[in-house]
Amino acid sequence: MIPWHYHTAVTDWYFCLAGILRVETRASRGDERLAVCARYQIPPKTAHRISNGGGGDCQFLPLQGIGAYDFNKVQA
């Protein structure tokens, strides 16, 4: 699991490669489960966490946009 956090200026993209990827945000969409080949965009300053959304293994590819990287922890 990637714990609750946000980025000040960087957009995150997550691509599900295997299994089911769970993307939780504190924005309007809240809780999404991605199947293989699905993607999810998280804009800057949006608190989010990433975890396995199914019973089996999960693989995903995180990509981050251009900008200074930071990892700002958020209370659960």
Tell me the role of every PLM-derived stretch:
Residues 17, 43, 51:
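Residue-level detector of conserved, well-ordered beta-strand and adjacent loop positions
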Residues 30, 49-76:
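Double-stranded beta-helix
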Residues 1-9, 44:
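Conserved short histidine dyad/triad with adjacent acidic residue
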Residues 7-8, 34, 53-55:
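Short glycine/proline-enriched turns and hinge-like loops at secondary-structure junctions
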Residues 27-45:
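Short acidic-glycine-tyrosine-enriched beta hairpin
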Residues 8-23, 27, 63:
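Short, conserved beta-strand element in jelly-roll/cupin
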Residues 1, 20-22, 47, 57:
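Structural motif
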